[in-house]
Amino acid sequence: MKLYLAPLEGITSYIYRKALYQCFDGFDKYFIPFIRAKQNLNFSGREKKDISPENNSGMYAVPQILTRNADDFLRTANQLKEYGYQEVNLNLGCPSKTVVTKGCGAGFLARPEELEQFLDRIFSKTDMKISVKTRLGMENAEEFPRLMEIYNRFPMEELIIHPRVQKDFYKNTPNLEAFGEVLAISKNPVCYNGDIFSADDFKRIQSQFPDVECFMMGRGVLADPSLAREIRGGKAADQSDIRRFHDLLYHTYREEVSGDRNVLFKMKEIWFYLAPMFADSKKYAKKIKKSERCVVYESAVNELFANCRFTGTQSK
């Protein structure tokens, strides 16, 4: 069994990944949120920090690339190889409209002929391992048999499938029937991704698909950072675990990010997922959300930890 951390844009940065690794770990691979491949070979300052080997020490990190241009993909992959990476991931799953309208992410799935040419070029021109993260299609799962014909032509490190279509975003439920059909015909190793929010969710998916050996989790980890540890038979997070995790995240953001506003933007996003682990936390979560200065934020966080009973995943 292998467990992977999904790449979540704007959230699972190197700061988040390092804190998660130090406090909980449990993951075999940590996927880095997508890098937009471009003709300009220079990575941005943020991208350089995210892919820096120093900031991913001890982890098997996999950078994700977003593009529909094969040459741009290859340039970016080769540059990542110089950083020491052995594997890259192609993003064919992002449902964001700003990405899809450019024909990237899940938007690329609507162009199967172009996608096939793209894959043919990148797999023939690099010796790096390439995994693919995909959805079932743009509009409906009936699009996927054609996509599978394409995917089966190429020696992927893994095919990571989120069994929703683009228009679902994160609504509805994963199409497990379609996933099972895909699993039966895939010539590549398949990884399951989608709606694993608890150890029970994991057991349910694993029992339904016993041949699947790899599972990717994203939002479930944001809501319970100890989820991978729990799945592996370890203990669930307690309040002190979450406090340690929070403090490490917060202090690192203060060191790495300039300005209270930017630091608090990051932390408020984290609390959107963490607050439900505490009973009767709405009042304090609101204070956290309204805080505009770090000193006010710190006071609100201390109040929440002091006054709200920690219930963990049961309060979701």
Regions found by a protein language model. Give the residues of each.
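Flavin-dependent oxidoreductase catalytic cores
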Residues: 1-316
